[in-house]
From Swiss-Prot:
Any single GO CC term annotated in Swiss-Prot or TrEMBL for this entry: cytosolic large ribosomal subunit
Coiled coil: none
UniProt keyword list: Ribonucleoprotein, Ribosomal protein
Gene responsible for this protein: rpl14e
MF annotations from Gene Ontology: RNA binding; structural constituent of ribosome
Protein name: Large ribosomal subunit protein eL14
InterPro entries with a match to the protein in the record: Rib_uL2_dom2, Ribosomal_eL14, Ribosomal_eL14_arc, Ribosomal_eL14_KOW, Translation_prot_SH3-like_sf
NCBIfam families: PRK04333.1
GO biological process: ribosomal large subunit biogenesis; translation
Length: 103
């Protein structure tokens, strides 16, 4: 299955300490990594590079340009009326082998 990950796509982190939080893709580094931001005041996710296997795309997308600043992303989220949607945390649905299954 090919993930639809493009600039402005709202994603959910499925692994790591920020699992279950939503973020926005602001840049595509290569076929394995993207740069995301919450921005931190809205979702608690700070701007960072993440592996695409650690995020799950949603059907929502906001209109931003590549490399947009956190302020520009926050304004675009407010303009799209997605502030409450972005603040909601979801239970990540990571499908893979867990440590318990390897024993």
């Amino acid at each position: 299955m090919v993930k639809v990950i493009d600039i402005g796509r709202v994603v959910v982190k499925v692994l790591g300490r920020e699992a279950g939080r939503k973020a926005v893709v602001v840049d595509i580094v290569d076929e394995n990594y993207v740069v995301i931001t919450g921005p931190k005041p809205i979702t608690g996710v700070k701007r960072r590079r993440v592996n695409i296997n650690h995020i799950e795309p949603t059907d929502k997308k906001i209109d931003i340009k590549r490399g947009a600043s956190d302020d520009e992303v926050a304004k675009a989220i407010e303009a799209a009326g997605l502030v409450e949607y972005m603040r909601e945390r979801v239970k990540p649905s990571f499908v893979g082998i867990t440590k318990a299954e390897t024993k």
